[in-house]
Amino acid sequence: MQLYHHPYSIDSQRVRLALEEKGIDYTSYHVNPITGKHMDPSFFRMNPNAKLPVFRNGSHIILDTIEIIEYLERIAEVSSGIEDATFNREVVEWMRKIREWESKLFTLAHIPDNRRLYVSKFLRMVVIARMAESPDLASAYHRKLREAYDTEDKLKDPGALRRSKDHLLRLLDEVETKLEGTTYLAGNEFSMADVMLIPVLARLSLLDLEEEYISSRKNLAEYWALVRRRPSYKKVIGRYFNGWRKYATLVKTWMFVRVRSLLRKY
């Protein structure tokens, strides 16, 4: 089994958390979306959406995050011979509810404009370069260019940004209420619902928004402290973004983009 992913990707974090929690072995391939590696023709042919993660088991390829997690759940049950009682209807409902909030727009809105626009321009140049290399994929690459411009338009729309924030606030308020009576999101046992939520909280922390969105909610703050102690969190997220590590991770990527842009090597 192979997983194409990157530590920056929320959906990648979700799948990796599930893999670690289930104890499933896999081969890891890093595909950095900020440096444009997800636009390489070999990856693009496998996944024309150019989104992460991509899970592959032999000839079987799964692109949807929840479908990947459900597939991993079935693998774990077959391997153990025991049905996971924590994977129930409530868990699935929470998984889908959490996914409804789109993190990309919110994240980009909290990145300084000069850096965001610099990376955006770099990625557009990467797409154009790959289009020249693989003309048979031109229509798919054109679609990615349109998506990039659409995203920039949304970032200029105060209404779109407000709706994204309001959606997140409603979700966190609902989680806060739920955690009033349970240790974890779908009960007193850790489940795949938590796997979907944890990367959202990690993203807020990465953006230095923990005080506003997490600490201000008592139950959520206690939950956040609890899940960060899990070995899966430490391996998937903590090793890249805890303390000084987040600066090392971000600086390394930023320098790559700067150098490639200066050399015009896309």
From Swiss-Prot:
SUPFAM superfamilies: GST C-terminal domain-like, Thioredoxin-like. The keyword Membrane applies. Its EC number is 2.5.1.18. One of its GO terms (cellular component) is plasma membrane. PROSITE patterns: GST_CTER, GST_NTER. May be involved in the conjugation of reduced glutathione to a wide number of exogenous and endogenous hydrophobic electrophiles. This is Glutathione S-transferase TCHQD. The gene is TCHQD.
